[in-house]
Amino acid sequence: MKKVLIGLVCGVAMSAAAAPKLVLHIDFNTAQFKREVVSDMLHEAARGGYNAILWEIENKVKLDSLPGVPVEEAFTKDEFRGLLKEAEQLGLEPIPLFQTFGHAEYVLSKPAYTNLREQADRYDCYCVSKPEVAELQKKVVAEYLDLFGPKVKWFHLGGDEAHIFATCPVCKARKPMELYSEHLDAVASVLRAKGVRPGIWCDMVMSDKYVADLAKVPRDFIIWHWDYQVGAKNTWTLPWTKQLPKARDLGFDVVFSGSTSSYGDSPYFPEMSLHRANLAYGADLVRRERLAGLCVTSWSVRQNLKQLQRPLVRFAARRLRSPGASAAADWAEVLPTCGVTMSPADFDDFTAWAVVICKYDGRGWRWFKDAVPPPADELDRILAKHGKPDAAVVSNLLAGVRRTLPQAKGVWREAGELQLQLLESCAAIARGERPLPPPHEKVVNHYGREQTPASARNSAAIVLGLAPGKNTKLK
């Protein structure tokens, strides 16, 4: 591209040819992190060459515009401003993220906000036909802008995985993408008035269902394209990935988003081999296609510690900023800097997991991001619906952990021991036996390395929540 400035839309400058941003996502969903842990993430990002933070704060900062929503241990605004000041001193641009369609559990589960739901019995999606939804969200966005300060240039409005979007009678009477775009435009007006560019995730607007109407989305919106599988072997390709050229042809700036932690991981480790390949693919794509940036997401609902994602955080930065001769060589150089004391091949076996056994711990037991432990009989319901875990898959994973665990040290060994215990429980269930009692205090202490006390206890309750009920068929 020869031109740096490709246009003005609604008064917001659109830049395409600048050096790509390298963005680290800090996600407060599910977990309330200690201040020093967030500070450590910021310093890690700055050392690695990241120049922006995507802040997904949800209910972990005490906002005036969302009374009754923040958790008890949430940061005060002054405490959080201290972290923002630290990030600024490290050269990290703030990019706030506020969900405007789905993933609204932390708001809509509260009694004062039930009138904003798309469906009365679901609390994950806003009904954007209701004027009071846009009114509330504009107030929240305005408070975010005040909190994050004048350094904000981009603002992420979420927009992903709104699974029941446009299903109420009023919304259903509208063309979905017209409704979607109108709501985005209304909320984004607060941003445009300050010269801030809005952005959204890709999966709604670039899905097979809606991609024909992608042109209805205003061009000043940055498309945050996410695919946490592409580039890895033996995985699926998400439908919106094949639509990426269309978004570029329509003139959208695009950020590619890979991940260090996503669906399919265990609660103790990210699956290193998958995420490594995905991030290498993403970094190469951003450089080759001159995209607007690479975002390294980290979804806290998956629970594994941020410090155990550090090899992937460093690897992604290296592959974008100063790639070596090969991704494998870069990975081999990164691992020892993160306290890994085994070969890359052994490390892959040590951290391996399988999507098919994710349902046998308590995370995401009803597919809501609401940080609620499962009920007492949930394991029995899962067994009735899905059957027992695949014994061969569990056995293969167990063999890898047992073989490599003696090489691990420090927090890596601690997480490996917990991974081993969880796999042994899965193996017992596969045999039709009751799993061993979980090491509750060890798990609380493990998550307590990074989370506040109440948050660590809740995380342990979620992960360990699938205990057999009174009427279980397990022996």
What are these regions (language model features)?
Residues K2-K3, K473:
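Polybasic, lysine/arginine-rich low-complexity segments
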Residues C10, A18-G199, F256:
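Feature activates predominantly on carbohydrate-active enzymes
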Residues M14, A18, S109, F165-A166, ...:
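Residue-level recognition of conserved structural "scaffold" positions that shape functional pockets
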Residues K3-M14:
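Sec-dependent N-terminal signal peptides
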Residues V38-H43, G82-K85, G91, P131-F155, ...:
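Substrate-binding groove of N-acetylhexosamine-processing glycoside hydrolases
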Residues M1-K2, A46:
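Universal eukaryotic N-terminal targeting presequences
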